[in-house]
A protein has these predicted regions:
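N-terminal low-complexity, intrinsically disordered segments
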Residues: 1-4, 65-67, 71, 78-82, ...
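Short, extreme N-terminal segment that most often corresponds to the first beta-strand
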Residues: 1-30
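Structural motif
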Residues: 10-15, 75-78, 107-108
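Short, catalytically relevant binding-site loops at active-site mouths
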Residues: 16-17, 42, 110-112
Length: 116
């Protein structure tokens, strides 16, 4: 069992914000709650433009995810831990099929990466 199920996901994509937002809604069968907020039966996702995004830094090293254009803040609700982790892995698989890069940062990242 993990003490904290909060999850941050960095996303590297050329998609504009609206396309990424729509993709996320489709990937998780979510509902738009606010301009940058998606809700589902199992989680809430805040979709953020990364304030640290830096084109020059990105061009120097596109693998440095701290400078990617977007990130997601994900909080679980009303779900068992094991199912939540599976759902996160499914979300990341969906994103990896459409984005240049996806990096997860959380207490259970090794478990998620092992499922993909």
């Amino acid at each position: 069992m993990y003490d904290d199920l909060y999850c941050k996901v960095f996303v590297d994509t050329d998609m504009d914000y609206e396309k990424l937002f729509a993709l996320l809604i489709n990937c998780i069968d979510g509902k738009k709650e606010a301009v940058n907020y998606i809700i589902t039966e199992w989680c809430d996702i805040s979709v953020q433009k990364n304030k640290e995004y830096n084109v020059e830094q990105y061009l120097l090293d596109s693998t440095d995810f701290l400078y990617w254009k977007y990130y997601l803040d994900i909080e679980p609700h009303n779900i068992e831990e094991s199912q939540y982790i599976k759902n996160i892995a499914n979300l990341l698989s969906c994103l990896k099929g459409c984005c240049k890069g996806v990096i997860i940062a959380c207490d259970f990242e090794d478990e998620v990466n092992g499922m993909m």
